[in-house]
Amino acid sequence: MATVIKNGTVYQNGRLIKADVLIEGKKIKAIGTDLDAEKIIDAQGMLVSPGLVDVHVHYRDPGQTYKEDIKTGSEAAARGGFTTVGAMPNVTPVPNTPELMKKMVEENKHKGVVHIFQYGPITNDETTDIIPDYAALKKAGAFALSNDGHGVQTAQTMYLAMQKAKENNLIIATHAQDDSLFNKGIVNEGVAAKKLDLPPVTELAETTQIARDLLLAQKTGVHYHICHVSTKTSVELVRLAKARGINVTCEVAPHHILLTDSDIPKDNGYFKMNPPLRNKEDQAALLVGLLDGTIDLIATDHAPHAKSEKQGGMKNAAFGITGSETAFSTLYTKFVKEEKVLSLEQLLALLSDKPAKVFGIENAGVLEPGKNADVAIFDIEHKNEIKEADFKSKGVNTPFTGQKVYGETVMTLVDGEVVYQRGTK
């Protein structure tokens, strides 16, 4: 049965247009005016967007399914308007063999309600210097490589990894962190560390590893992608590298542009994340980086934890913040609706077509005839409160609970099928 989404404002190819979207089967059939079908979805006053693309999520499955699993994580993505995600490999066991990778890919397809692309690890268990068989992992379904949560500590290991990744046309996506400089820190070296008397994290833990890796990327020619850049110096390093022709891309997480360490009101585990919230100068530089193209995309780093793991103060709390269900609404409210730092078109590009393009994900992040019918419909005119009770994720570890925001997801379709609808369980 054909479906038409009528009366909405459609984001297509960088523009907002008044149009209808006709869906037949799993594909978009047409975008235009006065389209008709047996089933009509009225999007009057709504934004009709390509399904958003999040290249950085943690689903904890297998190994830590009390925090999240593929089903709940993908349902959370759908509730946030995301229809394509990249799942990090920090699960147990790490998918470091073709057999384990094939199993992960099959589980993602079977249990997930959105399209899930699976990362393979850069090193065998994400902390050793042993490099797995990238060719075999790619053949088994790995779409990129990452040790997210861990930096690759030795330059030699990263150099070899980049060479092998280049040979196999795989992206290296890194969590840039020198553990000797991170030194068991908790919050950014700044106001919160002093106020709360917590171990500080120097920005050098991030920036020195980025500088090292950029030189290695220049030598090898690999596509080097930096996860969740968080400092002014990181942005400057990437800007310089791009000017020199190094094949580098990077992402920023919503919380690093929405919050700073000055926003941490007390010793609250919901504000503990890695990289930590930085200062206002860093935040401003991240926004400039988004606007001038130094930062290529926004990715949530959705990192759910059990409530018990975020209680008892920041020293004992786990690192991480959920993001799938709050990203679009919080970003739209602050940067488009209120502060007018970004246009709606710019925000949507950073959350849809740009991440798909950077990672070479075909059929994602665009609304065009012949492409997958992956669509998100947002209510951008009315405010709604972020409530724990509404979350699909098992993790409610976010400091944004209680905020009133515009941009709630009304409906999400994947391959033409409704996978989320506001007001339904």
From Swiss-Prot:
SUPFAM superfamilies: Composite domain of metallo-dependent hydrolases, Metallo-dependent hydrolases. Binds 2 Zn(2+) ions per subunit. One of its GO terms (cellular component) is cytoplasm. Substrate binds at H58, Y59, R60, N90, N274, H305, F319, G320. Pathway: Pyrimidine metabolism; UMP biosynthesis via de novo pathway; (S)-dihydroorotate from bicarbonate: step 3/3. Coiled coil: none annotated. CDD domains: DHOase_IIa. Pfam families: Amidohydro_1. It catalyses: (S)-dihydroorotate + H2O = N-carbamoyl-L-aspartate + H(+). Its EC number is 3.5.2.3. The active site is at D301. Belongs to the metallo-dependent hydrolases superfamily. DHOase family. Class I DHOase subfamily. HAMAP family: PyrC_classI_B. This is Dihydroorotase. It comes from Lactobacillus gasseri (strain ATCC 33323 / DSM 20243 / BCRC 14619 / CIP 102991 / JCM 1131 / KCTC 3163 / NCIMB 11718 / NCTC 13722 / AM63). The lineage of its organism: Bacteria, Bacillati, Bacillota, Bacilli, Lactobacillales. The gene is pyrC.
